[in-house]
């Protein structure tokens, strides 16, 4: 079957963006855009594409949820034994992408990921719903399983083991991404999009520049 995709396109025209309109700090500017996405009721505004490269040199990507912005770092949580967890142990450099089509915007972030302190992971894990905490024990993430029944059986087993308080599994926790390159993209007519790039400087400040679309 052949698909005709050539004529599928939208014309973007909602807003403009220039380096002069942006805050000096890239993460502060990101928080403004994130809050605007939340206020606009964009579905899953914290969903981001996380791309990583494993020890085999192969890239992989998936959607994960941003769970915090603290001290200039972006936090997310996962199973450390999953494919992405193992990739980040082998190569900590990542690329993140947020796409908010309702606002005709995307944000591209590059940086280095590192595990957060255990107490930070403990605090977030304790805030999760009971069934989600059980799922962190039941799912041997990214490993092949015989059937869905295997997963259901494991969830029931851990539910019996932890009927009330579910401790955080040692193989589950957070990563914090320290960004060094952040690009803000605003869709514009005729594909003449606005792109503003922040680059981290040796003194900890950020430079801003406009990129060709």
Curated annotation (Swiss-Prot):
Sorted UniProt keywords: Flavoprotein, FMN, Oxidoreductase, Pyridoxine biosynthesis
UniProt KW Flavoprotein keyword: yes
Cofactor binding, per record: Binds 1 FMN per subunit.
Cofactor(s) of this protein: FMN
Chain positions recorded as substrate binding sites: 9-12, 67, 124, 128, 132, 191-193
Swiss-Prot/TrEMBL GO biological process terms: pyridoxine biosynthetic process
Pathway(s) it belongs to: Cofactor metabolism; pyridoxal 5'-phosphate salvage; pyridoxal 5'-phosphate from pyridoxamine 5'-phosphate: step 1/1; Cofactor metabolism; pyridoxal 5'-phosphate salvage; pyridoxal 5'-phosphate from pyridoxine 5'-phosphate: step 1/1
EC number: 1.4.3.5
Binding site for FMN: 62-67, 77-78, 83-84, 106, 141-142, 185, 195
Reactions it catalyzes: pyridoxamine 5'-phosphate + O2 + H2O = pyridoxal 5'-phosphate + H2O2 + NH4(+); pyridoxine 5'-phosphate + O2 = pyridoxal 5'-phosphate + H2O2
Domain of life: Bacteria
GO molecular function, one term: FMN binding
Subunit structure: Homodimer.
Family note: Belongs to the pyridoxamine 5'-phosphate oxidase family.
Function text: Catalyzes the oxidation of either pyridoxine 5'-phosphate (PNP) or pyridoxamine 5'-phosphate (PMP) into pyridoxal 5'-phosphate (PLP).
Protein name per the record: Pyridoxine/pyridoxamine 5'-phosphate oxidase
Annotated organism of origin: Chromobacterium violaceum (strain ATCC 12472 / DSM 30191 / JCM 1249 / CCUG 213 / NBRC 12614 / NCIMB 9131 / NCTC 9757 / MK)
Taxon lineage: Bacteria, Pseudomonadati, Pseudomonadota, Betaproteobacteria, Neisseriales
Gene: pdxH
